[in-house]
């Protein structure tokens, strides 16, 4: 469990695209750990996991991207924000010492999720890439496919029931898409990541249709940390789904937008369940680290 004690610490972090400045970070539990810093900004061939699972919800504005670093230092990137966030994504990865991504997941073809993946694939060493079986005729999607081809990679199909061999200490299981549909959001890859007694549910833009399919599949949806679906849209995070997940903490990847994200409906549901909410628009990048028994939550800003 996270202790209730909150304290301030200061770490060096990138002001992406402008240089480096000192920013305040808020930290709950344990001791401070390194985030983006001037000391670890150089490209390295290996990331140090330090025995912790690190799930980093990168602040990419109105988009989504999560960087996972396993206890043994293996890396996974889920989505990479919009097209205009390509350079920021590269700065983030550099700041975390990542030059190789063992796994890349493109949750679905929407530009605010896969827009930066082409540049990431062009620049970094890539192990495997998974995407759902759905096509798009957008320039963003075609650019991603071209980068994949140039790298000589083969896309593996992301679907419910698939388990990924990433780190022997961490279970990574895909819970969606359960069935094929023409709707991009409801073809989103949903993954549950479990390390010891701790668990994370990463939902992409999955909406009510996908949530219902997961519930009906009988999958174990319970997780301590929930990435709120579709940036907090009222089309996602249904009451029934939230009751099944029973999260203690939730992260909403959202920026300035005209969609009304996150919606009051979803925020009220989370509040009713007494879920502690972290938001990229308020807190900046959010890192949740687990030692298998508890969590450490670090935010770029106090919110």
Feature map (PLM): residue ranges:
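Non-globular, low-confidence helical/coil segments that flank catalytic cores
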Residues: 2-303
């Amino acid at each position: 469990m996270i202790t209730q004690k909150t304290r301030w610490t200061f770490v060096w972090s990138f002001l992406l695209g402008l240089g480096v400045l000192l920013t305040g970070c808020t930290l709950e539990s344990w001791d401070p750990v390194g985030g983006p810093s001037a000391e670890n900004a150089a490209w390295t061939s290996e990331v140090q996991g330090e025995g912790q699972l690190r799930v980093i919800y990168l602040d990419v504005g109105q988009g989504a991207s999560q960087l996972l670093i396993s206890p043994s230092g293996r890396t996974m990137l889920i989505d990479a924000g919009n097209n205009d966030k390509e350079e920021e994504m590269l700065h983030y990865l550099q700041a975390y010492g990542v030059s190789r991504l063992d796994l890349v997941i493109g949750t679905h073809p929407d530009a605010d999720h896969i827009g930066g993946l082409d540049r990431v694939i062009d620049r970094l060493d890539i192990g495997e890439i998974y995407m759902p079986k759905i096509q798009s005729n957008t320039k963003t999607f075609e650019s991603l496919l071209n980068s994949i081809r140039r790298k000589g990679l083969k896309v593996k199909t992301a679907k419910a029931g698939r388990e990924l061999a990433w780190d022997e200490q961490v279970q990574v299981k895909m819970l969606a898409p359960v069935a094929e549909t023409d709707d991009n959001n409801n073809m989103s890859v949903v993954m549950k990541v479990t390390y010891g007694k701790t668990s994370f549910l990463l939902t992409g833009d999955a909406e009510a249709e996908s949530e219902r399919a997961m519930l009906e599949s009988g999958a174990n949806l319970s997780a301590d940390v929930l990435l709120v679906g579709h940036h907090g849209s009222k089309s996602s995070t249904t009451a029934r789904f939230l009751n099944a997940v029973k999260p203690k903490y939730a992260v909403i990847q959202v920026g300035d937008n005209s969609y009304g994200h996150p919606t009051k409906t979803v925020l009220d549901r989370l509040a009713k369940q007494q879920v502690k909410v972290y938001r990229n628009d308020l807190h900046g990048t959010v890192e949740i680290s687990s030692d298998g028994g508890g969590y450490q939550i670090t935010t770029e800003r106090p919110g």
